[in-house]
């Protein structure tokens, strides 16, 4: 028995050893003599959820086994020195720190005992900490540094320098040749990290912002306080637009440690500073040409004066990387030419033996810093410089999550940064990318993307992954600041199965193909400066998809730019959402569809709207709710190449100041509109008016002499004009808004195209069913079947289509459900399905109606395109139906100008949209869509009317006429949400189960309101009722749709972080076949259908629950707790008999601007056994933008300032960097109850939110908690005026100071004109957006109107005890702030001086006479100036100073 057990143990041990051997990540590969043996490393082993294709060639990493035969440390040796490594010779040694060993390196002591070339290779499998020596700079010279899996190197402010073998003295060459073999993959000299930790901490700041004082003098923004040695031990490297690769200088320094006097070196040019350079960054480091070095990784050749060489840093294997305050210089081997990799020739009999090499000439990924498959990479406040040669890129990331902030990257390279495949999350914040332009020959080289070879064009950031966040980055000298290059189905290149942009595949049994989802870019406030080497055609953004099929929908959100953009998207749509463009902005390139939505465009080169897209090739271009600046008195011509499927609702205005008085809230119609001739259409425009001036609306048409003028109704801010269209055709209406107090300025609003139809007759109808015998009769119209593949007949379908029967019911009538029970779609996603049908050749005008069922496979948008005779009708429209099936009705007009007898209709989808039936009308058909005219309570009185043609005519009443359409000729179809299929995969057996669901009936007669639209109308109604640049980036949370297992205890998710547990209850998905309940819907939308609701408004919805079991169940509804909304249900619990249904009613009120995406639980409990199951359903409701915010959406960041009354923080709100002020609520001001005070707070904040002026900070919103009022405003990147002059000690010129005060006075003038006082004027509250005196806006006022919510300081009350008028107090505060700005210091004993009736006099007489006069007028007790007077005086002074500066420039 014992022998049996022993044999069994031995067998288990043998199996264990074999399993360990098989599980090894590395494999040894033998090579020919003279070469290092290689290790084969599974480089993608840590790339989760993706299995690589072994045949792709990129799955294995081969690296030389340089750690073989290394000298190992003594066990437990604590210090890295000669004694710790038995066998150490001191000449070209290879040392290994073993696993479990923790060593420290006192680099000074170590270098004392080692020769320069003593350390050939250092391999780290344990932990090595390099200590910081504050008294002396030290470095670690090494040829090869390798961190093995699990190893860690932590260095504090010391340097690693890599020496190359050719630099070794000839006396040592013979010994070197014995120790060194050939590295075929060119990793060394350099650093190789194979799955460990690299932590590099510099001890001091490296980069500073500076400004030029003269040719040889500059001033730092903050003092240089880190100097420990004499000045000649340091060197300053200057980076500007004219010197993007830096210029080295020695320097002397003033006592303030900010003023630097530059001295030419013996080895650098140190050219004079150029006055034309707008940006200057400097790097101060130890002088590497003397005896010391700064904290950096560099080539050893720099120190010893050899010619520059190359090294590289290669990091892989899920390593952790943290680098801060480090200088990485003169590394990088991969040139900016086509890649040429070394290839291995394996033995035909042994895959672990290499018998030869095909040597490459340009090995990829040997960059200054290359990181792959590492999920934790942070690089901040570093300097990375490549100056020796033209490389591909100093930074390359592959399959990693990377955070870069406040770095300076300088190179002459194809790209400053390349985000390779799999780098789905990279954040670049406030980095400075300097680039010396690449040669035209190199940039124009055509590389091979299939070989992962790209990024040579002169890019800032080059990305092949969509999830790149760039915020406040500076790009200097590139041809393209940011380039996105998308390659569909990346698995062909990377070898990853299912590798496209995550999430990129579906688990559906019907849709096994990979799906390319829409892509959202995140680019905030990029800044670009050209250099002398920049091409004449440069772009801030370049998007390219290589003509890939299928196309997708790209969205660029909230881009703020001064520069052009370019794109090449032959098969895709591009949407700019929330674009703010000015200066040199234009567009160039091609896209299948281009949308510009909710945007502001003001380009200096813009003479008309057409110029924005004059170099754009697109099948459909649309402007939606977008503001476009024009020059005064200039007429802008609307774009005329619109097609069906695109929208155009642009708002033009001549000056941004006009928005201070009038804002356009909405127009109707706001999408292309169709109407039956003889019907009434109420054309309207709704305004938000702050000014009391009279505003007139002049309605006119480009294609007629029609013109009518009416006044805006002051009670509701609307202009409504009822029109009757008698003649068939197209009409382009517009309205001109003029303000009586400023006739030079006006709006022009172009309405979407209005199409007027006569009545047509039903010609034919077809139903998509796999049968040639059936036909359907609907309201007297025959819908035939028989559309077959490759069968010549009345209707033919292309062979790449498939029939799907048993589609879910999407209406409430059996008659309609029969019509939509079957459909066709493409076998392969996005392949066009073509239907050939007969048409009336005698009729020139026809209408075609298509009926689709959208059965979504996920929550993503699905793109739909429709063509007739290869001409686009409907292009790449985004359809979304949540998780329920939905019916879509699309109708368009077709002119049969060639008298064709048959036509080809094609459509493309990703495979989840089915064409179920179609109808053709000709001659005289009743219009399918009858718009509902807009009613109004009162008819505006026309002030003048001129009607030269009867085409549209005004009507004396707003009562709508009845359409001449008869009910028997209408096609009434419901628009519901249906059952969706739950897809469950168990091994190779997959079940696909449908449950029928129903929704409330909604007819197609009013398809402008229900979302099903005709012709050029989008499927989903667009509600452009207000312009708001802060748009949301996401709609649904992915975790709302996870598949859950069946635990006995399940937690309900709530955004308010409340957790509800069901103890002893089994969880089942709502569509699980084992659940005894069925539901009429799984998502409650409260009738919104994707649109947004008003806050503080009650919404209602209902849910029908059916008991499908044979027992009585007790049903209980458990609602989430969420302070952003109030949801109730009635009844919340009840008993439900077998096979019976009951409807429960829900009510919802949203309390603030929020996305109320919640789960709620339905629990079913057996009335006798008390066994219980529960499931989750969903509430998806989003509010419109309001001034009241959801506190949970505000992410509080670093503190800016605080006092006993309030705190100010930087915060994030919906992806936007903002400022958050939190005011304590136990203020002495609150004499009323707490609830009354809160109500007053929201009322006043709502008023402030309506104030818009370029010199006041934008108010985003507010909220409160139990102890604080929260106020969210615009973020100022340059801080406050106080911090500029008191903390940063920046010196301002006289004209700069005048410009700052002029902006302040203009802001105060606006506030006083709107009866807003308590402006709280002080340097802390003047936020800087620029210090360039010629910029339009330099200062914005913050905290106006907020002071009343804080406790007044007692001294402040005494100071102003004699002041009766708050406006005078504001002027006084302005005078004090002006005085403080001129002296650049705060007046002392200010309160005592004022109480004694005096004013500050220190250095007052030294001020400019005009300035002194303005200041004294501000604090004159008898006759104090108004801000209008102050603005005029400052404007005059500013103009004089500007003219004087221009004269000096011309003289020089």
Curated annotation (Swiss-Prot):
Principal localisation: membrane
Gene Ontology MF terms in the entry: ATP binding; protein kinase activity
Topological domain spans for side Extracellular: 24-972
Membrane-spanning residues: 973-993
Region (Disordered): 932-965
Intervals, Cytoplasmic compartment: 994-1452
Protein keywords: Membrane, Signal, Transmembrane, Transmembrane helix
Domain Protein kinase, chain residue ranges per copy: 1194-1452
Signal peptide: 1-23
Record has Transmembrane as a keyword: yes
Family: In the N-terminal section; belongs to the GDT family. In the C-terminal section; belongs to the protein kinase superfamily. TKL Ser/Thr protein kinase family.
Protein's recorded name: Probable inactive serine/threonine-protein kinase gdt6
């Amino acid at each position: 028995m014992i022998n049996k057990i022993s044999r069994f143990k031995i067998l288990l041990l043998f199996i264990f050893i074999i399993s360990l051997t098989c599980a090894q990540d590395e494999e040894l590969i033998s090579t020919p003599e003279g070469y290092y043996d290689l290790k084969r490393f599974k480089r993608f082993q840590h790339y989760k959820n993706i299995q690589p294709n072994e045949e792709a060639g990129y799955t294995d990493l081969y690296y030389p086994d340089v750690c073989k035969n290394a000298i190992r440390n003594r066990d437990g040796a604590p210090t890295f020195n000669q004694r710790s490594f038995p066998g150490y010779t001191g000449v070209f040694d290879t040392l290994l720190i073993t696993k479990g060993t923790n060593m420290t390196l006192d680099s000074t002591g170590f270098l004392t005992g080692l020769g320069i070339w003593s350390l050939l290779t250092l391999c780290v499998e344990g932990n090595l900490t390099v200590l910081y020596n504050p008294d002396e700079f030290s470095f670690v010279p090494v040829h090869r540094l390798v961190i093995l899996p699990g190893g860690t190197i932590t260095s504090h402010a010391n340097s690693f320098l890599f020496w190359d073998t050719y630099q070794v003295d000839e006396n040592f060459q013979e010994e070197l040749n014995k120790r060194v073999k050939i590295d075929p993959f060119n990793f060394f000299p350099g650093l190789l990290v194979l799955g460990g930790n690299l932590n590099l901490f510099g001890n001091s700041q490296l980069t500073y912002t500076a400004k030029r004082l003269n040719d040889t003098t500059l001033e730092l923004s903050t003092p240089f306080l880190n100097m420990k040695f004499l000045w000649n031990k340091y060197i300053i490297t200057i980076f500007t637009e004219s010197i993007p690769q830096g210029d080295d200088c020695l320097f002397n320094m003033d006592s303030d440690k900010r003023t630097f006097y530059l001295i030419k070196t013996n080895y650098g040019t140190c050219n004079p500073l150029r006055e034309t350079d707008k940006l200057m960054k400097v790097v101060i480091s130890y002088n590497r040409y003397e005896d010391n070095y700064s904290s950096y990784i560099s080539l050893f050749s720099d120190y010893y004066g050899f010619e520059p060489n190359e090294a590289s840093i290669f990091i892989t294997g899920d390593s952790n990387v943290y680098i801060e305050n480090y200088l990485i210089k003169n590394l990088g081997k991969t040139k900016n030419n086509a890649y040429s990799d070394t290839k291995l020739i394996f033995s035909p009999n042994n895959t672990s033996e290499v018998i030869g090499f095909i040597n490459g000439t340009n090995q990829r990924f040997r960059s200054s810093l290359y990181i792959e498959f590492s999920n934790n990479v942070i690089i901040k406040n570093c300097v990375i410089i490549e100056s020796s040669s033209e490389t591909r890129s100093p930074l390359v990331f592959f399959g990693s999550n990377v955070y870069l902030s406040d770095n300076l990257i300088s190179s002459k390279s194809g790209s400053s940064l390349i985000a390779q495949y799999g780098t789905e999350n990279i954040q670049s914040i406030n980095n400075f990318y300097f680039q010396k332009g690449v040669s035209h020959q190199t940039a124009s080289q055509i590389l091979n993307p299939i070989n992962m070879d790209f990024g040579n064009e002169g890019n800032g950031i080059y990305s092949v992954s969509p999830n790149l966040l760039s915020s406040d980055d500076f790009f200097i000298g590139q041809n393209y600041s940011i380039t996105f290059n998308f390659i569909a189905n990346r698995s062909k290149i990377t070898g990853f199965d299912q590798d496209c942009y995550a999430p990129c595949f579906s688990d559906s049994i019907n849709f096994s193909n990979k799906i390319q989802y829409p892509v959202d870019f995140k680019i905030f406030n990029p800044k670009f400066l050209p250099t002398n080497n920049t091409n004449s055609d440069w772009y801030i953004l370049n998007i390219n998809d290589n003509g890939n099929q299928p196309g997708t929908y790209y969205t660029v959100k909230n881009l703020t730019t001064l520069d052009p953009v370019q794109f090449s998207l032959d098969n895709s749509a591009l949407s700019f959402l929330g674009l703010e463009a000015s200066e040199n902005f234009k567009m160039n390139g091609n896209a299948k569809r281009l949308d510009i939505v909710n945007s502001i465009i003001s380009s200096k080169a813009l003479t008309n709207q057409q110029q924005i897209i004059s170099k754009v090739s697109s099948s459909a271009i649309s402007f939606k709710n977008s503001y476009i600046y024009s020059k005064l008195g200039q007429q802008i011509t609307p774009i005329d190449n619109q097609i069906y499927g695109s929208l155009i609702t642009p708002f033009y205005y001549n000056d941004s100041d006009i928005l201070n008085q009038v804002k356009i809230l909405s127009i109707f119609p706001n999408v292309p509109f169709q109407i039956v001739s003889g019907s009434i259409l109420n054309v309207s425009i709704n305004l938000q008016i702050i000014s009391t001036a009279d505003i007139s609306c002049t309605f006119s048409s480009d294609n007629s002499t029609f013109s009518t003028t009416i006044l805006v109704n002051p009670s509701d801010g609307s202009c409504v004009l009822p029109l009757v269209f008698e003649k068939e055709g197209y009409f382009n209406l517009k309205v001109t808004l003029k303000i009586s107090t400023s006739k030079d300025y006006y709006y022009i609003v172009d309405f979407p195209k209005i199409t007027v139809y006569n009545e047509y007759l039903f010609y034919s109808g077809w139903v998509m069913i796999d049968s040639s015998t059936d036909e359907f009769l609907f309201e007297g119209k025959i819908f035939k079947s028989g559309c077959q593949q490759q069968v010549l007949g009345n209707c033919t379908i292309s062979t790449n289509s498939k029939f799907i029967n048993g589609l879910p019911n999407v209406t409430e009538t059996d008659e309609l459900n029969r019509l939509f029970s079957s459909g066709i779609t493409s076998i392969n996603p996005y392949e066009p399905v073509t239907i050939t049908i007969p048409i009336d050749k005698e009729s020139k005008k026809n209408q075609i109606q298509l009926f689709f069922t959208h059965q979504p496979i996920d929550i993503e948008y699905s793109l739909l395109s429709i063509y007739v005779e290869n001409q686009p009708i409907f292009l790449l429209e985004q359809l979304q139906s949540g998780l329920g099936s939905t019916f879509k009705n699309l109708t368009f007009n077709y002119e049969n100008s060639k008298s064709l007898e048959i036509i080809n209709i094609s459509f493309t989808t990703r495979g989840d949209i089915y064409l179920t039936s179609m109808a053709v009308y000709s001659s005289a058909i009743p219009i399918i869509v009858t718009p509902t005219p807009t009613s109004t309570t009162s008819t505006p009185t026309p002030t003048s009317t001129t009607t030269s043609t009867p085409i549209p005519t005004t009507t004396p009443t707003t009562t709508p006429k009845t359409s001449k359409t008869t009910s028997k000729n209408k096609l009434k179809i419901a628009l519901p949400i249906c059952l969706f299929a739950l897809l469950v995969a168990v091994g190779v057996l997959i079940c696909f189960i449908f449950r029928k669901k129903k929704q409330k009936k909604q007819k197609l007669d009013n398809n402008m309101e229900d979302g099903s639209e005709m012709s050029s109308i989008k499927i989903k109604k667009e509600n452009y009722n207000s312009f708001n640049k802060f748009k949301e980036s996401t709609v649904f949370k992915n975790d709302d749709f996870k598949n859950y297992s069946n635990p006995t205890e399940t937690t309900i998710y709530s955004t308010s972080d409340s957790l509800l547990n069901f103890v002893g209850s089994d969880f089942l998905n709502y569509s699980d076949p084992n659940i005894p309940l069925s539901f009429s819907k799984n998502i409650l939308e409260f009738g919104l259908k994707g649109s947004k609701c008003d806050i503080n408004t009650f919404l209602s919805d209902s849910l029908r629950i059916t008991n499908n079991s044979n027992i009585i169940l007790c049903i209980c509804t458990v609602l989430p707790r969420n302070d952003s909304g109030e949801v109730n249900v009635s009844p919340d619990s009840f008993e439900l008999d077998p096979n019976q249904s009951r409807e429960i009613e829900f009510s919802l009120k949203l309390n603030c601007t929020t996305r109320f995406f919640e789960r709620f639980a339905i629990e079913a409990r057996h009335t006798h056994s008390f066994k219980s199951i529960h499931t989750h359903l969903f509430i998806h409701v989003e509010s419109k933008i309001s001034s009241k915010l959801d506190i949970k959406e505000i992410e509080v960041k670093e503190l800016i300032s605080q006092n006993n009354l309030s705190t100010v923080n930087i915060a994030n709100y919906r992806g936007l960097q903002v400022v958050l002020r939190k005011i304590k609520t136990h203020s002495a001001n609150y004499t009323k109850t707490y609830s009354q005070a809160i109500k007053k707070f929201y009322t006043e904040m709502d008023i402030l939110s309506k104030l818009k002026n370029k010199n006041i900070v934008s108010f985003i919103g507010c909220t409160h908690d139990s102890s604080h009022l929260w106020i969210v405003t615009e973020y100022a990147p340059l801080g406050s005026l106080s911090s500029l002059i008191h903390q940063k000690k920046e010196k301002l010129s006289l004209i700069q100071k005048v410009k700052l005060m002029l902006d302040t006075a203009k802001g105060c003038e606006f506030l006083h004109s709107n009866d807003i006082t308590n402006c709280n004027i002080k340097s802390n509250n003047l936020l800087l957006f620029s210090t360039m005196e010629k910029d339009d806006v330099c200062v914005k006022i913050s905290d106006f109107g907020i002071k009343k919510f804080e406790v007044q300081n007692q001294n402040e009350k005494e100071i102003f005890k004699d002041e009766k008028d708050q406006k005078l107090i504001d002027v006084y505060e302005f005078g004090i702030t002006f005085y403080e700005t001129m002296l650049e210091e705060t007046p002392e004993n200010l309160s005592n001086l004022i109480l004694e009736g005096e004013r500050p006099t220190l250095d007052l007489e030294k001020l400019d006479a005009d300035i002194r006069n303005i200041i004294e007028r501000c604090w004159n007790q008898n006759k104090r100036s108004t801000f209008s007077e102050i603005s005029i005086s400052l404007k005059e002074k500013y103009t004089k100073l500007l003219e004087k500066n221009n004269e000096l420039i011309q003289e020089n």
